[in-house]
Amino acid sequence: MSSSYGNNGDKNNHEKFGFNLLRKKPQQPSNRSERRADDSSSSEDEAGPSSNYVSSSQLNLPSFRPSGGSTDELNRANRTNVGSSDARYSPRTASNTESGNRRQQMIEDDAIATIRDNSGAARCFDDDDEEEEEHQEQKDSGENPADISPRTSGVTKKLQFKSHPSIIPEDTATQDGGEYYEEKDAEKEDQDDSVSTQSSESKMDHFRHLFRRRSTARPHQETNDGRNSAESHSKGGMRNLNGADDEVEDGGFLSKFLSLTGGGLTPAVNNTDPSGENDHERNAGQNNLEDPIPMSDIAATAQQIVQAHSMMAGKSAPGTQHGASGSASSEHPNGEHNLGTEAGVTSPFEPVSPFNQSTDGETMVSSHQDDAFYVPATNHYDDIDDPDDLEPLGIEGSYIAPVDRVRGGVLGSLLKLYQNQDDQYTKSQLSLNDSSIEQTPEPVDQAGKSDQKTGKKIYNPFHKHSKSQTNVSGANKSGSSMNLPNFKATRPKAAAKNLVKAKNFKKKAAAEARITVHIADLLQRQRFILRLCKALMLYGAPTHRLEEYMVMTSRVLEIDGQFLYVPGCMIISFGDMTTRTSEVQLVRCNQGLNLWKLHGVHSVYKQVVHDIMSVEDANMEIDRILTGKNLYPPWVSVLLYAFCSSMVTPFAFGGDWINMAVAFGIGLCVGSLQFIVSQKSNLYSNVFEVTASIVVSFCGRALGSIPNSNICFGATVQGSLALILPGYIILCGSLELQSRNLVAGAVRMFYAIIYSLFLGFGITLGAALFGWIYHDATNETSCSKNISPWFRFIFVPCFSIGLGLINQARWTQLPVMTLISCCGYVVTYFSGKHFANSTEFTSAMAAFVIGILGNLYSRIWKGFAVSAMLPAIFVQVPSGVASQSSLLAGVQSANAIVNNSTTTVVQDDLSGSMSFGVTMIQVSIGISVGLFASTLFIYPFGKKRTGLFTL
């Protein structure tokens, strides 16, 4: 094809787009580039043909030369093209040709400077497939590539700007090979044709060609900007070469105006946004795009996401043990999972378990095993399970072997719950707010897609679904698995997305509910242990085995607990192996005695241990017991106290019928102080024993001083104080010392001794007060008249019944209590006849019989041994004290105080008080030895079955 076609086409196109505006002043030297070209024409004439080409050193440019080519070769090609154009257009003279060549070189120099200042692009490359396709079409059609440019100037998608060969990177030319030289030759021919056909307006024509090529090449430059930006920076692209000085020298007004207007005065040609050319945010992070993608990092990240979110879609089933754990499949052992499918992960609907068993740090989303809430039990350093330590009271059912695992603590469960929520916001910047994985829509980077055609599909930011979105429903539907970001464009269906979102929401809620239920269940179990401990302490359980009861209870409930008992306080520590922490609780209460409520607490404990009653129901039952009222109101207890005082006086202290009546009246006074006044005033309760002993001693000596009244001072005083004697306190202390609970036993025993001294001091003070008032007060401590011993068969059962009722026993418990008490007293009576003045031995024999009967009742009839044995023990204490008459030893000291014989007062008072304390200790030691011996006799080999409480 001739070049005239191209020129005509150019002319038409110029007139079409308004280029004739530039023809009005074609030769004005106002343009800075034209003036510089005219000034340099003389120097170029002297240089000769060898200086037709401007080297890169003159332009302060690096030597960008294609491999295999040089400047001389390019100059020879230029001269060849010029010669061919002269031959084609013979009317032109040689001078015109020379001037045309010089003008052509000046135009090219000015164009290069303008491009260097404004464009910064070396060469716009399309993808290999598109170039091959374009050149194949050109070869098939037989057209010259130089002829295509003017003909397709209106089509902006196929036009590219091919800059001077000297500014083309070397590696680019090496890759393109022959295609590059074809484009170069076509460009040269096009320029030579334009020079040969123009005279005075040739410069403006070349500028029009240049502007058209720049404007049409800009869309392709924007398309491949991400891929070529790193190359232009690393190879010294033209944008990096211009500085402040170069911009002032080379840039003209027209070039700056054109650069600001986006590449020309024809708005129809430019269809790109000029503001995005220097968008630093879009160009940021493009330095290492030519490096290969590290697939190992992607695999590691995928594995982490698999482990964190694998079981989110797994099926869970509620546990059967204590309602706290679920179940799941562990078919795949560790190391069996891989990044298998097209997306690189397994399916979310397949139960993936990175570990065979749940670990401490596992969340409930990724673990549904039955042992998800369990941790290994802590090896506590106690001697409860020491095989060398023989526990003589190891009765049936009270021993529970240590468990291998326990439930995790509250803190560990809360951390699992929070970790469960945090995992949805951490891994790989994925959003799990709506239980679906979506990636932020961003323009697709075309740099890494050399094997794909960019085509005509341009990113549309207003499209609803971008190609970079990855939705979990599409991945699940295609079976590509674990909801990782997929590089393939998928368009999920709304129905499937909503379905998966609902399923994931249900599974997330189920996981949180399971953790919440576990925490609630754990708190219920810990609360049950605390309430059980308080109830046992408050209602009079055997204190020497209280720690063991708590340990066995915690083992049954799978709670990691440690217990330390001191009188009046239980220190409880709940451990958490998950976080290596512990929670310490203190249970403090005054020890009391309530046989019926103690029986109810024991019943609840037994049902919980044998899995008959749930922990929630047990807590409600214990709360009902703790908040429930006593069986008998205080005024009934006062009458019962007086009744018991009158019943104990004949058979224990040798009183007659009159002394029984007097003891009843004084007992009413003492009972009122204990059950009414002491319950309303905490301050008075601290001095109750001393004040009660003072009142009893004062009233008893006053009544006994009445002439011819036959009132025995000693019988009435001891009978009235029999129910407040520290027999039970000393008994518990001796049992604790016998079971090697040294801390509690020593403290309780010392308190019992001081308590006895309080009573002795009160008796002495009351007798001395009445002696100061009445100088003829009686000094006799023994009774002259006694009731027949056969009446004791009536008094002892009545006293036992009264003791049971005062201690809030139900009437159904009274027959067993009365029987055991009568049997114990028979042994005490006949052994006292044979072993005179041997309190310890007599008490030991009686306690042995009482222990045998109580343990047989517990083993055969599955009864409650403690409630059956305690009234019988209380019967033994007054009998032992009465055998020594130590309680009235202070009366002699009172007489000495009244008679002002102070020389022996201190010694007598000390001996009297200490003798009473020693007598109480002797009785308690004999009782404790007898109880241990009876337990060993009933359970010779430590057989343990169902009996839970014993003395």
UniProtKB/Swiss-Prot annotation:
Record has Protein transport as a keyword: no
Membrane topology: Multi-pass membrane protein
Regions crossing the membrane: 635-655, 657-677, 687-707, 711-731, 753-773, 786-806, 811-831, 841-861, 863-883, 918-938
Family membership noted in the UniProt record: Belongs to the ThrE exporter (TC 2.A.79) family.
Entry protein name: Pheromone-regulated membrane protein 10
Chief localisation class: membrane
InterPro entries for the chain: ThrE-like_N, ThrE/Ser_Exporter, ThrE_2
GO molecular function list: transmembrane transporter activity
Keyword Transmembrane assigned: yes
Ranges of biased composition (kind: Acidic residues): 126-135
Protein keywords: Membrane, Transmembrane, Transmembrane helix
